[in-house]
């Protein structure tokens, strides 16, 4: 139920609530998988939220996303079985101008609530 290029940052509470519930359930699934396998399951959160054009208000979508993430991660789970990660979005088709989940946004999020922060590094290997 992605709408207008947004999920957790969408102004429509119904859209946000759908993705909040999805996030909560994915955490429980990851914890279950960790318990069943006896290994820590990494649950990576990546949201595609963004806009093609420069918005006047960059703060409000990020505020909505932060509140949604706080709700998703409210319940503490056993890190022996699952650890959460957030992954920033650089840009994408349809979101060239503004990305809600920027690198800086997720660095702040990870420092206060999340176990891991995924750094996407691109390495170019020259083939001979």
What feature does the model see in each segment?
Residues 2-113:
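Active-site acidic/histidine proton-transfer and metal-coordination neighborhood
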Residues 116-128:
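Catalytic alpha/beta core domains of metabolic enzymes, predominantly
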